[in-house]
Amino acid sequence: MPFLPEPLFQHGQPDRTAILLVNLGTPDGTSPREVGRYLRQFLSDPRVVEIPRAAWWFILNVLILPLRSRASAHKYETVWLREANMTGSPLLVYSERQAHALQQLLDAQGHDVVVACAMRYGNPSIPSVMQTLRKQGVERILVLPMYPQYSGTTTATAFDEVFRVMGQMRNQPELRLVKHFHDHPAYINALHQQVGAYWAQHGAPDFARGDKLLLSFHGVPRRTLELGDPYHCACLKTGRLLGEALGLQPGQYLVTFQSRFGRAEWLQPYTAPTLEELGRVGTGRVDVFCPGFPADCLETLEEIAMEGQSTFRVAGGKDFHYIPCLNDSEPWIAGLADIAQAHLQGWPLALPHPHVLEASRTRAQSKGAAA
C-alpha cells in the first residue's frame, strides 16, 4: 500500500499539538448534484446504515438518491447563509467559527495549540485536514468529535476515518480521542447558559400554565440500542442534567428524537408527533432546544425551526420558540476549552525556546543531516 506524501523531516522543528474538531458534514453547495454527492458518501457508510451492502447499493442509488437529492437540495437552499461574513452551510460556518474562537482563547491562555475543524463527509475532509496539520509540524492530535453523546453511527465512524488516514501515514502522530462529553459540567453549563440567555431576552415559558421545553436529539434506529449503543442513555442523562440545572421538574421538559429515516422503529418519542400532540391539546408555548447539536445545521434550522414550528401551529399550538444551538457562544467556547484541556494533560502545550531548537538543528547538521 502506498503511503501519503510526508513533509521533509526537519531537525530543530518544534513538535506541535493540535485539536481536531470533527463534525458530520455538509454538501459543498445547494445543487441537487452537490447534495447527492454528499448524501451518497454519508449514506454509504456501513456504520450509518447497517444493511447488506449489495441490497443497500441498489436501494440507495436507484430508489433514494434520485428523489432525496432534489428534495434535500431545496431544504439546504432555505438555510444556506449568504451574508458578507457568513457564507455557506450553517454547519460549516459555525464549525469554523468555533475552531477560530477556540484558537483565540487558547492563544490568549498562552498555549501553543493548533485548532482545526474537519467533516466526516464532504469538505474540509478528515484526510485533507490531517495532512495539513502534519505539514504544520503537528506531532500530537486530539480528536474531539462534536457529538456530545457517543454513538457508533457518529463518533465511531469519525474515529474510523482518522484511523484509516493514520494507516496511510509513514510518520504517524500521537493520537488521543474524546469519546463523549454528554455529562461534562462545562458542556451542561454552556447549555444552561444558552437557554437562560434566550429566556432572558425573549421571556421564559410559563411552566405553571403548562408550557413545555422540548429537548430534541438526533434519532437513531432503536436496534442500535438493543445491540449495545449507549447513545439513548447519554441523551437522557444530558436532558436530566440540563433540566435540573434549569430548575425544571420532569414533565416540564421532554426529551424527544428527530430526523427519523426509513420505516424501521427509531428511538422514541419522536419530535414531530410530540409537537403535533402538544399543539392539538392547546399548549400555549413550546420552546425547542437541540442539546446534541453544538452547531446549528439543516436538522435544527429547517427541520425544527421551520417544519417543527409549522407542525405545532397547524395542530393548534400557539407560541413556538426555537432556541439556537451553542454555536460560537462564549460559554460554549470556554466549555470546549475545558473539555479539550482535560484530555491534553501531559502533552506539551508550549513551544521549546528557540535556542533549544537551534542547538538541536546544529547538532544534527554536524552529524551530516541536510536539514
Curated annotation (Swiss-Prot):
One of the protein's GO biological processes: heme biosynthetic process
PROSITE patterns: FERROCHELATASE
CDD domains cross-referenced by the UniProt entry: Ferrochelatase_C, Ferrochelatase_N
Keyword presence, Cell wall biogenesis/degradation: no
Pfam families for this protein: Ferrochelatase (PF00762)
GO cellular component: cytoplasm
UniProt keyword Transferase, yes or no: no
Compartment annotation: Cytoplasm
This enzyme's EC code(s): 4.98.1.1
Gene Ontology MF annotations: ferrochelatase activity; metal ion binding
Reactions the enzyme catalyzes: heme b + 2 H(+) = protoporphyrin IX + Fe(2+)
Biological role stated in the UniProt entry: Catalyzes the ferrous insertion into protoporphyrin IX.
Listed name of the protein: Ferrochelatase
Gene name linked to the record: hemH
